């Protein structure tokens, strides 16, 4: 036992070089690559089986996509053509109506320019003459009536005074006559003139009656004004134009475009003539066969290379162990030689006593091993595990009663099993078991989810979702397409109205502002010159006939152009397109509406069943693969457990050798 140590010696270390991390990693990579190859091979086989078993479904789906696409494109195209033609006819009719409006406006403007001007001037002359005559007679009547009344009053006053004087003279003459004659006979002249009353009362009743204006006002009332003349002319001219517009509005655009039933719609194909899968079955088999061969060759080559590297990695590891052991032994020898000078003291019996620099308990027989100290210092977990194992084996004994040799044996076995390489194997094994447990949990959850979701009895199952998702997806895509297309149409319409008709709007607004300014300036000038005179109304009427009425017509025309100079592009209604497709499907004479729906439903059911079986088959395959990985992890853990009997065998051999020595 004198040569037995509690730590691993060079031979012990070299016995574990095949457990180095490089070899183990390469071996694990080889196994993982092998499992991966098997997984790929199995997935390829599943894919091959699935494709070959669903050739009819694939052919049917491909046929529906390729053969029936013209049918639905034809329906949508015919609908768009119909709506486009209808909107074109409506736009043409609207254009004709605008042309009629413009023509009527031009005719009215021409009539107003030539005939209207003269008619307006004639009416204005009559109205102006009557107005001047009326104003003149009113002034004259007022002047005459006021003057005659004043003169009559003044004459009455003068005549009254003269009458009083004459009466006084008559009275005096009568008295003189009576004095001289004394005759009371009243037959003479003086008796006949009692008094004199001079008056002009009849002159008070002299006046010019106001009824003299009635004839003039009656003439003015009977004379038509320009507005009446203009309205009468416009009404006569608008008769044919209104008739044309009425006929245009009565036109039905839907009747003009003709019978849309003559538009051809490609029929729905009922057969699966486009057999993209069944017609290429031999090529599919050959392709999968080539894939399998390539996979096998690549797997063999890679595994061979990995094995060579794994074996080759042992040589540098062994060489490193030898060099490390030599350094450790050199360190120990150097320490043993140097301790005589640094760490010795002489007792009374001239025996050497070792000064332990790590403050360890005194070692019997005066032996101190620096490698043991190194292991205790730098491999603390090994030392702790060794202490736990010693306490477990010697349960119930105090540390002082434990045999040092037994303790050394336990520490050596623990050191052998907890070496860096052995712990690496243990860690890999435990990690592999943990990964396998996680994989089993995931597989169980996936199986439960697949079995629960891919059932036809579940109302929220994938099968029902697939049945309803087609229509929903078409409707959503149609709505999205119509919205995006309408956005494009809105942008285009705005750009056209701004870029093409923008200058028209700017011009019409500028012309209207100019016309309004001109009319305001003309009215201001007339008011400044003729306001308060008899010529103001006639001049205003003449200027209105000759200039302002034309300006108002131009302003009205510019406003009409401003309102009409805009492009309105019809929008796309996704709901109408969907209704047209549904109507076409209802009116179709081809018996594919119900049969296609039933076939599609059966096809979806078959696809769901195949999908469920395929997924479960793949999960079962990965379950088997996970079992294989768990087996490998358990084998790795067993390799670590094998280190215990190996350590016991080595320990027994050394003990026997020490006994023989």
Curated annotation (Swiss-Prot):
Secretion signal span: none
Annotated S-S bridges: none
* Membrane topology, from the record: Multi-pass membrane protein
Write out the GO cellular component annotations. mating projection tip; plasma membrane
Q: List the stretches on the Cytoplasmic face of the membrane.
A: 38-105, 318-424, 651-661
Record has Zinc as a keyword = no
Localization terms from the record: Cell membrane
- Main subcellular location: membrane
Please report which protein family the annotation says this sequence is part of.
Belongs to the PRM1 family.
Transmembrane segments in this chain: where?
17-37, 106-126, 297-317, 425-445, 630-650
Q: What is the role of the protein in this entry?
A: Involved in cell fusion during mating by stabilizing the plasma membrane fusion event.
The name of this protein is Plasma membrane fusion protein PRM1
Q: What induces it?
A: By pheromones during mating, through the regulation by the STE12 transcription factor. Also induced in respiratory-deficient cells.
Q: Which residues are glycosylated?
A: 135, 145, 188, 197, 231, 252, 272, 280, 490, 505, 512, 531, 573, 587
Q: Please tell me whether the keyword Ribosomal protein is annotated for this protein.
A: no
Q: What is an annotated GO biological process for this record, any one?
A: plasma membrane fusion involved in cytogamy
Ordered alphabetically, the record's keywords are: Cell membrane, Conjugation, Glycoprotein, Membrane, Transmembrane, Transmembrane helix
Residue ranges in the Extracellular topological domain are 1-16, 127-296, 446-629
Q: Which PANTHER family match?
A: PLASMA MEMBRANE FUSION PROTEIN PRM1 (PTHR31030:SF1)
């Amino acid at each position: 036992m004198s040569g037995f140590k509690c730590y691993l010696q060079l031979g012990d270390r070299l016995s574990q070089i095949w457990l180095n991390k490089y070899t183990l990693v390469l071996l694990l990579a080889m196994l993982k690559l092998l499992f991966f190859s098997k997984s790929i091979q199995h997935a390829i086989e599943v894919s091959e089986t699935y494709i070959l078993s669903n050739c009819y479904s694939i052919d049917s789906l491909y046929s529906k996509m390729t053969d029936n696409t013209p049918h639905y494109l034809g329906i949508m195209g015919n609908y768009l053509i119909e709506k486009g033609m209808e909107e074109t006819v409506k736009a043409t009719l609207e254009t004709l109506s605008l042309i009629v409006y413009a023509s009527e406006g031009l005719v009215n403007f021409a009539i107003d320019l030539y005939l209207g001007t003269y008619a307006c001037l004639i009416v204005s002359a009559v109205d102006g003459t009557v107005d001047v005559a009326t104003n003149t007679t009113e002034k004259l009547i007022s002047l005459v009536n006021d003057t005659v009344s004043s003169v009559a009053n003044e004459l009455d006053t003068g005549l009254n005074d003269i009458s009083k004087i004459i009466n006084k003279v008559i009275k005096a003459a009568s008295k003189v006559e009576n004095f001289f004659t004394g005759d009371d006979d009243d037959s003479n002249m003086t008796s006949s003139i009692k008094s004199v009353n001079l008056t002009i009362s009849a002159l008070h009743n002299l006046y010019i009656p106001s009824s003299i204006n009635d004839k003039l006002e009656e003439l003015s009332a009977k004379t038509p004004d320009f507005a009446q003349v203009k309205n009468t002319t416009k009404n006569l001219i608008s008769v044919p134009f209104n008739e044309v517009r009425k006929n245009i509005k009565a036109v039905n655009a839907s009747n003009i475009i003709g019978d849309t039933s003559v538009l051809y719609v490609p029929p729905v194909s009922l057969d699966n003539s486009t057999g993209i899968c069944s017609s290429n079955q031999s090529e599919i088999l050959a392709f999968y066969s080539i894939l399998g061969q390539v996979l096998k060759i690549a797997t063999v080559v890679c595994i061979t290379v990995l094995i060579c590297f794994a074996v080759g990695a042992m040589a540098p590891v062994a060489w490193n162990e030898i060099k490390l052991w030599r350094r450790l032994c050199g360190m120990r020898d150097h320490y043993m030689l140097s301790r005589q000078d640094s760490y010795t003291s002489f007792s009374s019996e001239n025996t050497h006593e070792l000064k332990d620099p790590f403050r360890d308990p005194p070692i019997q027989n005066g032996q101190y091993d620096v490698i043991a100290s190194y292991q205790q210092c730098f491999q603390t977990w090994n030392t702790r595990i060794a202490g736990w194992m010693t306490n477990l084996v010697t349960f119930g004994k105090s540390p002082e009663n434990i045999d040092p040799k037994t303790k050394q044996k336990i520490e050596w076995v623990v050191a052998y099993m907890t070496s860096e390489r052995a712990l690496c194997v243990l860690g890999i094994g435990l990690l592999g078991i943990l990964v396998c447990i996680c994989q089993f949990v995931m597989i169980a959850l996936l199986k439960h989810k697949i079995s629960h979701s891919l059932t036809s009895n579940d109302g929220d199952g994938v099968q029902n979702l697939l049945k309803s998702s087609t229509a929903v997806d078409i409707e959503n895509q149609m709505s999205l397409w119509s919205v995006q297309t309408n956005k494009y149409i809105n942008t285009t319409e705005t750009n056209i109205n701004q870029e093409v008709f923008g200058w028209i709007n700017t011009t019409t607004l500028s012309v209207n502002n100019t016309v309004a300014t001109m009319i305001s300036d003309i009215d201001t000038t007339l008011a400044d010159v003729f306001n308060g005179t008899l010529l103001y109304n006639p001049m205003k009427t003449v200027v209105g006939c000759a200039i302002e009425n034309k300006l108002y017509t131009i302003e009205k025309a510019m406003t009409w152009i401003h309102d009409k100079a805009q492009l309105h592009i019809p929008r796309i209604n996704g709901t109408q397109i969907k209704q047209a497709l549904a109507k076409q499907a209802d009116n179709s004479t081809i018996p594919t509406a119900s049969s296609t729906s039933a076939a599609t439903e059966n096809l979806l059911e078959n696809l769901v069943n195949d999908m469920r079986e395929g997924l479960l088959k793949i999960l079962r395959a990965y379950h088997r693969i996970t079992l294989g990985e768990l087996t490998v992890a358990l084998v790795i853990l067993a390799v670590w457990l094998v280190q215990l009997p190996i350590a016991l065998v080595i320990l027994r051999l050394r003990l026997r050798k020490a006994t023989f020595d």
